[in-house]
Amino acid sequence: MTIKSVSVKGIDVANEQPFVLFGGMNVLESRDLAMKIAEHYVEVTQKLGIPYVFKASFDKANRSSVNSYRGPGLDEGLKIFEEIKSTFNVPIITDVHESYQAQPVSEVVDVIQLPAFLARQTDLVVAMAKTGAVINVKKPQFLAAHEMKHIITKFGEAGNENIILCERGSCYGYNNLVVDMLAMDEMKNYAPVIFDATHALQKPGGRSDSADGRRAQAAQLARSGMAIGIAGLFIEAHPDPSAAKCDGPCALPLDKLEPYLAQMKALDDLVKGFTPLITD
C-alpha cells in the first residue's frame, strides 16, 4: 500500500507539497503556557505562510523516571485542546498510549499520534484505526524503514489509510540517536513523511533519570531533513527550555521560532523547486 497524501482539516500533507508544521510543546504544563505557545506559533506560521497543526501531549507515559512530570491527564488535556482549537482555529495533534484513549481523543483532536515504542502494538493500532482519524506513526528507533510497511498494513486492514510516517532517529549504541537520511527518504515510498527534528536531538537516558539533548544543533539537523523534500516538520519549543518539564534539552527556544522556520521554508521552497533528478 502506498499513501500519497492525507488531508488534515483541509491541509494537504504530501511529500511533494509545501511542508506542514506540526509544532507546539512537549507536554501540557499549564493551560496558560499552552495558550501562549499556541498563539506564538499561529502568529509566526501565518506570517510565513506555513500550514500549521498544534502539538502537545496530555500524558507522557514513557518517562525515564517514575518521579518525572507526566502531564495533566486525559480529561484536563482535552479541555485545553478544545480551547486552543476554538481560540486559534488550528488542527491539533496529540499522542495516545492506551487503546481506551483513542476514541475520546479523536472526538477533539485531528491527528492521533502512535508513539514509537508502541508502534507494533496491534490492539492499540486497531483502536486508533477505528476512529477514522489521521494517524501519525512515529518510526521506532529499533526498526528499519522498510518495516514500517507492516504497520501501515495493520492500519489498512483495520480500515484506516490516513497515515503519516514520522522519523525521529535510530538507536546508535547506548544513550544516542542518529538520523539515517537515506532511510527517511525510503519511507517516502510508503506514505507522507514528517521529520521530528526535536526528538532526533535526544540522548535517551543521557541525564541518568531523564533524556539529554543537543539543542545547539537543532537547525543543522532540521535543515538536513528538509533537504530530502518531505511532507512536514515536527518541532517543540518552549519559552525557557531549561525550565521545561520534559525534553528541555531538545526544545527550541520559543523566541527563535520565526528565524528557524524562515530558514526551513526557504530550504523547502528551494528543494521542491528542483526538477526531479533520476540517477538510477
UniProtKB/Swiss-Prot annotation:
It holds the Pfam family DAHP_synth_1. InterPro entries: Aldolase_TIM, DAHP1/KDSA, KDO8P_synthase. GO terms for molecular function: 3-deoxy-8-phosphooctulonate synthase activity. Its EC number is 2.5.1.55. It is found in: Cytoplasm. It catalyses: D-arabinose 5-phosphate + phosphoenolpyruvate + H2O = 3-deoxy-alpha-D-manno-2-octulosonate-8-phosphate + phosphate. Keywords: Cytoplasm, Lipopolysaccharide biosynthesis, Transferase. The keyword Transferase applies. One of its GO terms (cellular component) is cytoplasm. PANTHER family: PHOSPHO-2-DEHYDRO-3-DEOXYHEPTONATE ALDOLASE. Belongs to the KdsA family. This is 2-dehydro-3-deoxyphosphooctonate aldolase. It comes from Colwellia psychrerythraea (strain 34H / ATCC BAA-681) (Vibrio psychroerythus).
